[in-house]
A protein has these predicted regions:
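Bacterial N-terminal signal peptides
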Residues: 7-17
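Mature extracytoplasmic domains of secretory-pathway proteins
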Residues: 54-99
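Positively charged n-region of N-terminal signal peptides that target proteins for export
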Residues: 1-4
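N-terminal secretory-pathway/extracellular module detecting exported/lumenal segments
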Residues: 20-65, 105-106, 111-114
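Short linear motifs at secondary-structure transitions and domain/linker junctions
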Residues: 12-13, 23-31, 71-79
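Polar/charged, Gly/Pro-rich intrinsically disordered segments
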Residues: 93-120
Length: 120
């Protein structure tokens, strides 16, 4: 029985991951495919709380990308206005800063990736 649990669990996890990815696609003015990755909230400090909304945007890639930095900037403003602001809770400490980040590939938060194209 245990032999079946691992493959079934993997299939279920992949199915759930696909469903989540499909649900988190966000429309932006440039029309590029943008997927919400996660939200990172810093602890309150002297500057207040910072909330980071991280998105995957493969079309900003240096090699083969089709979205210019100017178009990405407009997309980031739209993501702030239409995605991030509505999701900021009305209770608890309000953020002093909201950061929208786009990356052409998955990058672990806080780690550098010299091959990734990222806009903040």
């Amino acid at each position: 029985m245990r032999r079946w649990c691992m493959p079934c669990g993997c299939v279920l996890a992949l199915a759930l991951a696909s469903a989540v990815a499909a649900e988190t696609a966000v429309e932006v003015p440039s029309g590029q495919a943008v997927i919400w990755v996660d939200t990172v909230q810093d602890s309150p400090g002297p500057g207040g709380v910072t909330v980071r909304f991280r998105f995957l945007a493969p079309a900003i890639a240096r090699a083969g990308g089709t979205v210019t930095p100017e178009a990405a900037q407009a997309d980031m403003q739209a993501l702030c206005d239409g995605f991030a602001l509505p999701r900021i809770a009305n209770t608890g400490p309000q953020p002093s800063q909201i950061v929208i980040s786009l990356s052409d590939r998955p990058v672990e938060f806080g780690l550098p990736d010299p091959y990734a194209t990222q806009f903040f």
